[in-house]
Regions:
Chain B
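N-terminal secretory signal peptides
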Residues: 1-11, 22-30, 36-39
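Short alpha-helical segments and helix-capping/turn motifs at coil-helix boundaries
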Residues: 41-43, 173-183, 217-220, 229-230, ...
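Flexible, low-complexity segments enriched for small/polar residues
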Residues: 41-50, 55-69, 353-388, 393-531
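Cell-wall polysaccharide-cleaving catalytic domain and substrate-binding groove, primarily
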Residues: 42, 46, 50-96, 239-241, ...
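Amphipathic alpha-helical segments that form the core helices of the histone-fold
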Residues: 68-91, 215-226, 381-387, 508-511
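N-terminal accessory alpha/beta regions
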Residues: 69-193, 200, 205-208
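Alpha-helical scaffolds flanking conserved acidic
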Residues: 191-193, 231-232, 394-395, 517-518
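Active-site substrate-binding loop specific to GH73 endo-beta-N-acetylglucosaminidase modules
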Residues: 211-225, 229-398, 402-427
Length: 458, 531
């Protein structure tokens, strides 16, 4: 119980290492212990790219988001939950081309599609066949299909590798935590400690919702001094606490300032606030599930705008596991997709510089056919979305062989035509300047997928 | 919050042992590891070892110390003896209804009444929707429904029919937080095991249909079977409306069953998969996608029974009567007609499977011993589980008597739930009136848990919460513990009984501060974050 006899458990080492690094403790077993300048800005003179991943936990139904309206099998497989063919009226699929269209709740994304900054890959995922949410998420987050043991999250590894490459070295404030070289390069908003950000590199983890804007006890000088005295030791928990107090105050100040600025300048905030207060209402009623995502995205925007050292962002939303009564144009899934669309529009406002990229993905897809309760069960391949100026958007990329039974994985699910790691490899090489050797450190054994070479503009 | 009653747990047998006076100048536990290692004769443990073991017993078998528990530990012949005694006390307590403040008791109402009230809420909401649909057909129910404050835990008035579900969720939270923080009213080990099983067989209060049944599920599934046979617990969860709704089992029927208007209904794999992946075998338990499908077929027709005392009904006409093969065995077997029995047999078989024994044993060891428990301990527990046909009491005895449970190096960092309940426990123990839990404190606690990422009964996915430090020891989140500690101790002058358990460094730091801050700082201290 006393903290001076604490030793991290071997199993917990990855996430605990994050703390140790954050606290300036050498981590001998980490390949990234010494930050290396292993990534160069992809295009000299351009802004450094920032990558935001929005992860939909629970396996969202990609066939309802990117609707294959041109495939007769789609309607045969889903008699009661298919989205109606596009006919220009409300509640029907929004036509993108002869094969695909958008769910009507994704209408806010149409302008981005037309501008050519948004693309979708309809049959991507992990080659591992697991249909367990939790295993699939774990493997996706550590970047290694089939691996179940403890490992660092790939965004954490990436954050560690980017450390020191930032051209912008900010002056260290008086309250700065120990060691500027350990300033986080990655920020996650909403989850306690997502696996994808767990590892030896320092990351910033911010609370979900309004809580992120409050400094709490450490905001009051007297109380802070008293609490800090309790945590003045050199043990792990004390260092973590001090780093947390620092980071939390900074986070809350940044977010509060941004909020008061937007309300005084009226910068599009009224609509936003209306959106967000509606989100909150939904949340209070336990209605929507991507509820809160919009506010978390707004916080992510603010934090990454204010601290240019933050190059990687992570957001997630649950509630996509639609086993029953998922609806079609209306219903629970439609509400969630609507929240997602508003979130992406919001992220686009911030992440619209040359090499910025926003990715939306899920751990796996759902069955091609509806089940016996007007929902869908756990599947395999799924649609991934990519948004950014470098994206060769306005069209679908990656493989697609339709929903004919002979073309389905195990006669039931979408196959995987493009490995999710290959998609990220393209993005990381183009917008972060990573070499294949370095990408292989994030995704051991990944293979370059030439069929995706046209996905990005050079 | 409860009538002031003394339960067996609060009356430890006096073992004619001398009460060990706790010296206020004790060095705290900082030196206890050395002391423990050097205690050559277990009957001559040093005082700091005593304190260390008392803390471990109170914080892991329950949710931390109260003056009364401290006295009980001091008068027991050893912390280990006290700990093992709790097993039978907890079992006995689980066999009778829990103490419950009268304004919370409806959470445990007969199931048909809960179904009725939930139905009335649906009708009331539908009526509002009909009135407020705008020209585009959109409804603004949310704005209407939010025009009132429902955040108070005041249940003195009967619930508005429109807010029945919400009141049931809040009552469940109020009872849970009371039960985990009032060791006089609820045996602390029983509260712990209720937490463990609820988490293992998680249901989610955010899913509409589940909401009114949350409290009933906690009391009649997790608590009632907390120290019984695992297969009985599993079957109770399988048949409870909260689980039937949560994982969609209530509507899974034989493929091609008629659904009116010429439409057909059929299978839903959700419950069948999680039953194997999470409740029993584990993801590497050797089942295939086909086994998931066959289990789903076996369980077709298991649905809610709004008029049944146990809330469960087996609908034979919606059951798939064909032959199924689950992990190499036929269902129904030769002696049976196809029906409810084959589902019960399949669930019992999964419950007794060696992979299940291993999975439950690992999770129990992680809950009570360490994030990475020794494989030898886990396999010994799994063997005990199998030898006793999944008798949880027998497994717990092996666990709490193990050297690993008492070993100082097997540390556990408190989860937000541990921290919230232990803070609430210490604070409540200072109340002059032991029969009323301050509801404002419960609201504070509930809000803290939400902010910390462990909202009560509100984890969306069936895997339940993680318990390890890797998940919860996060810089910013640590500072939120301090917020809660300071907020919940506003009217608490001192927590002197905690002093001996804090390190000298911590005690010195606290002593510097003004008295009003001291109780909060004790709870916010690094020492208090471990159990």
């Amino acid at each position: 119980m006393p903290s001076n006899i604490l030793k991290p458990h071997p199993k917990a080492i990855d996430r605990r290492q994050a703390l140790q690094t954050l606290l300036g403790v050498a981590t001998a077993c980490s390949a990234w212990a010494a930050p290396m300048a292993w990534a160069q800005s992809a295009r000299p003179g351009q802004s450094e790219g920032r990558l935001v991943v929005v992860f939909l936990r629970g396996a969202y139904d990609g066939l309802s988001a990117l609707v294959p309206h041109g495939d007769a099998n789609y309607y045969a497989l889903r008699p009661s939950i298919a989205l109606a063919k596009p006919d220009g009226t409300a509640q029907t699929t929004l036509r993108l081309d002869n094969t695909f269209g958008l769910h009507p709740a994704l209408a806010p994304l149409m302008p981005l599609w037309r501008q050519g900054v948004l693309t979708a890959l309809p049959a991507t995922g992990s080659p591992d066949p697991t249909r367990s949410h939790f295993d699939a998420q774990h493997q996706w987050e550590i970047g290694t299909p089939g691996k179940s043991g403890n490992a660092a999250g790939w965004m954490n590894t990436l954050a560690g590798s980017l450390a020191g490459t930032s051209a912008d070295v900010r002056a260290i404030s008086a309250q700065s935590i120990e060691g500027a070289e350990n300033k986080p390069q990655a920020v996650g908003v909403g989850e306690a400690n997502p696996q994808i950000l767990a590892g030896s590199a320092a990351v910033q983890l911010v609370a979900k919702g309004q809580a992120a804007t409050r400094q709490g006890a450490v905001g009051d000088e007297r109380t802070r001094d008293a609490v800090m005295r309790l945590y003045s030791g050199q043990d792990e928990i004390s260092k973590a606490f001090r780093a947390g107090a620092d980071s939390r105050r900074q986070t809350a100040k940044t977010l509060s300032n941004a909020m008061s600025e937007s309300t005084t300048s009226g910068m599009g905030s009224n609509d936003m606030n209306k959106d967000i207060s509606r989100e909150m209402q939904l949340a209070n009623n336990g209605a929507g599930n991507a509820q809160g995502l919009l506010l978390d995205a707004q916080h992510l925007n603010t934090l990454m705008r204010q601290d240019r050292r933050l190059r990687l962002g992570f957001l997630s939303a649950g509630g996509w596991d639609t086993h029953a009564n998922q609806g079609n144009a209306l219903g629970a899934l439609a509400n969630n997709l609507g929240n997602l669309a508003n979130t992406l529009v919001q992220l686009r406002r911030e992440f619209s510089q040359t090499n910025d990229v926003v990715v939306v993905a899920s751990e796996f897809g759902r069955t091609s056919a509806e089940n016996g309760t007007r929902g869908t069960d756990h599947g395999h391949g799924n649609t991934m979305w990519i948004m950014g100026n470098r994206v060769n958007g306005g069209r679908v990329h990656g493989g697609w062989t339709g929903l004919g039974i002979g073309n389905l994985h195990e006669n039931r699910d979408l196959p995987i035509h493009n490995d999710f790691r290959s998609v990220f490899a393209q993005l990381l090489r183009s917008t972060q300047g990573l070499s294949n050797a370095n990408i292989d450190k994030l995704f051991p054994g990944f293979a370059w997928d030439k069929s995706l070479d046209s996905m990005l503009r050079t | 919050m409860y009538p002031n009653q003394t339960t067996a747990a609060a009356l430890p047998r006096r073992n004619a042992l001398k009460v060990i006076a706790v010296c206020a100048m004790s060095p705290g536990l900082a030196g206890s590891l050395n002391a423990y290692a050097q205690a050559s004769n277990p009957f001559e443990k040093t005082q700091s070892t005593q304190l260390f073991e008392q803390w471990r017993a109170m914080s892991r078998v329950g949710y931390g110390p109260t003056p009364q528990l401290v006295r009980a530990l001091q008068t027991a012949s050893s912390p280990k003896v006290w700990t093992v005694q709790q097993i039978d006390l907890a079992y006995a307590a689980s066999q009778v209804a829990p103490l419950m403040a009268s304004d919370l008791s409806s959470l445990n109402a007969p199931l048909p009444d809960i179904f009725d009230a939930a139905q009335r809420e649906r009708q009331a909401r539908a009526a509002i929707k009909a009135v407020t649909a705008d020209s585009a057909g959109n409804t603004n129910t949310n704005e209407l429904l939010n025009n009132r404050n429902n955040r108070r835990m005041d249940f003195s008035e009967p619930a508005d029919p429109l807010y029945f579900n919400r009141s049931m969720v809040q009552k469940a939270a109020a009872w849970r937080l009371g039960a985990c923080s009032q060791p006089n009213d609820e045996n602390p080990l029983l509260a712990r095991m209720t937490e463990f099983w609820f988490n293992h067989l998680n249901v989610y209060s955010g899913k509409g249909a589940v909401r009114p049944f949350i409290g009933h599920y906690v009391v009649n599934v997790a608590r009632a079977h907390a120290l019984g046979k695992f297969e009985d617990l599993l079957l109770a969860s399988a048949r409870h409306p909260a689980m039937l709704y949560y994982l969609d089992q209530f509507q899974s029927v034989a493929d091609g069953s008629p659904a009116g208007q010429g439409r057909l209904r059929g299978l839903n794999e959700n419950y069948a998969r999680e039953l194997m992946e999470l409740h029993t075998l584990g993801v590497a338990g050797g089942y295939s996608q086909n086994d998931v499908h066959e289990t789903a077929r076996i369980l077709t027709g298991w649905t809610v029974g709004p008029n049944e005392a146990n809330g469960f009904r087996f609908a034979q006409r919606l059951h798939d009567t064909g032959r199924k093969v689950l992990m190499g065995q036929y269902y129904p077997d030769g002696s049976l007609n196809s029906g409810e029995r084959e589902g019960e047999q399949a669930i019992r078989r999964l419950a007794r499977h060696p992979k299940t024994a291993a999975r439950i044993s690992l999770r129990l060891a992680q809950f009570f011993v360490s994030d990475s428990p020794a494989p030898a301990l886990v396999s010994a527990l799994a063997q005990t589980f199998q030898n006793s046909q999944g008798d949880i009491r027998v497994v717990l005895r092996a666990l709490l008597e193990s050297n690993e449970f008492w070993h100082p190096e097997n540390k556990l960092f408190k989860t937000p739930m541990d921290f919230a309940c232990s803070a609430l426990t210490t604070v409540s123990s200072t109340d002059k009136l032991a029969d009323s839990t301050d509801r404002r404190r419960l609201i504070l606690t509930e809000n803290y848990l939400s902010e910390a990422g462990q909202p009560l009964h509100d984890w969306q996915t069936p895997d339940g919460y993680k318990f390890d430090a890797a998940t919860w020891l996060v810089p910013e989140a640590l500072t939120r513990r301090a917020d809660f500690a300071l907020a919940i101790t506003r009217q608490v002058s001192d927590l002197d009984f905690l002093q001996p358990y804090l390190s000298a460094t911590t005690r010195a730091a606290i002593a510097q501060e003004k008295p009003a801050l001291r109780a909060g700082l004790a709870l916010a201290s690094p020492d208090f974050q471990y159990k």
